[in-house]
Each structure stands twice: as C-alpha cells, then as structure tokens.
Amino acid sequence: MSYVQEPFEKLDVMNNFLFNQLSTNPKTKEGFLRCLIRNLLGKEIGKIVIRAENMIYPTLPDKRGVRLDVQIDELNLKDDITTIYDIEPHRDFERDYPKKIRFSQAQIDKNSMSSGNNDFSCLPELFIVNITNYDPFGDDQMVYTFQKKCIEAPEVVYNDGVTILYFNTTGTKGGSDDLKKFLEYLEKSEPEKAVTFATQELQGYVEQIKHDAEIGGNYMTFGDLLDKITAEVAAEAAEKATAEAAAEAAKVAAEKDAIIAEKEAIIAELQAKLDKQQNQ
C-alpha cells in the first residue's frame, strides 16, 4: 500500500514537511516563528537562536533521546538563554501525550544546565506549545494552559517556570476572534483564510516556500522515499508473516505427529497384550 502524498501546493502549516520548511528556510524561519509566538502567546521576543528538528541525545546508550520539531532559545544581552519555546504541531491523537511532554521537558531541562552548576535560578523559563487539529481534552477550548498549582490551596502558585499550552484549531471557546482565525489558518492554509493581518503575514511565508521549485522537488523526492520505505516495510511484514505462518504450521504438524505417534504406541501396546492373551 503506497503512501498517499498531499499535493505540495495544498499543504497546510500543520503539515510536518511545510512546518519544517517554514522553520528552517533562511527567508522565512525567524519571521514565521516570531509570528507564531506573537499571535499564540501574545509576546514580542528579543534575540533568538532557532533549533529546528533539535535532537537531544540520551546520556546513556540504553536510554531514549527526544526530537523537538522546533526549539527557540531567547537570549539576554549577555547571550544567556532566558526562555525556551518548544513548538510542536500535532495532527494525530496520542493518548499518553502529556507523559511524552513530561519526558521532553526533562530532556530540555537537562540540556539547559551545565555540569557543576548548582544555581537553578539560571534554568530558563519554558513554554511548550502544542498545536493540534483535534480537541485533546474535549472542552472545545481554543487554548488549554497548564501551570503547576497546589491542590489544597489553588491560589498558591508553584512557580517552576514551566507553561504547557495546547492550541486547538477546532475550538470555539475561550479565545478572541483573531485567535480563532489564526488557528483556522494553521489548519487550512488557503489564501481565502488569510483574512487578518496575522494570517496574511503567515500566508506570505507560506507562499515563499510553495513558490520555491527546489523545495517542491524535495517534497516529491520525500514522497518517493516514503513510498519506498512503505513498500519495504510491507514486504518485510509479509515475509515475517509467511515465516510465522510456516513456523506455526510446522508446530501444528509436529503436535499432530506426536499425537498420532502416541496413539499408535497405545494401539501397539494393546495389540501386544491381545496377542499375548491369544497365545496363552
């Protein structure tokens, strides 16, 4: 079964390929990511370092690392990292995603402290921004914001510097009309959806990528590669299934032969007893 590839010109910002291109292309990456942070978080950010598809490797060979779609480090005048933004678009529901975020946060924090540094006030503020085209919590909110608080005294804030947000492109509650239009554009990135200043800015970045013939060619190559991988995986699965079926058939045949042999032994034993009785 081949991978069904969306036409390049129809890709939306939520598509992993287009999002990656927008986040890495020198012509679009800084403007695009600043636009996201400005309109999703309501923040203007200063000097930044962009780490697209940032891989945080494990410290031990038998442990797991983590890949972030795009990490943005905001710097102060001394070039120290003061805030980290991890932006992740998601088009597929994951039941255990909050725990996946917990793991990602631990990896980000681990990489934010140098060995021997015991001053935890240096740990940057962290915003984990998830953009989903489904409602992860079922309350129809445009945005779900999570920060730690005390259960017994909810007014007590546990300030560990971490804010986790889910922006739901299908939500209708809890946000402004501009935010709703912005989220709708992220899910369906068509010129007709670019009806606000912010969405028109996004549309400009999207057009720069889609009008680039080299990127379009890379996308077609990407699709061919996925087709090849899909075919190889299918062939391996079929080969494994055939081998497993053959092994199972051999097992059944062996069990059948064992039962027949056991019955034949019993019959032979009975026959021997009958022969002995007849000869007496």
Where do the protein language model's features map onto the residues?
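Accessory alpha/beta interaction modules
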Residues: 1-163
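Short, charged alpha-helical interaction segments and adjacent helix-coil junctions
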Residues: 2-10, 73-81, 85-90, 177-280
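Alpha-helix N-cap/helix-start motif
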Residues: 30, 97, 175-176, 195
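Short beta-strands and strand-coil junctions in structured, solvent-facing domains, enriched
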Residues: 137, 173-174
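Low-complexity, glycine/alanine/valine/leucine- and proline-rich hydrophobic stretches
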Residues: 151-161, 165, 174, 182-190
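C-terminal regulatory or interaction extensions
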Residues: 169-171
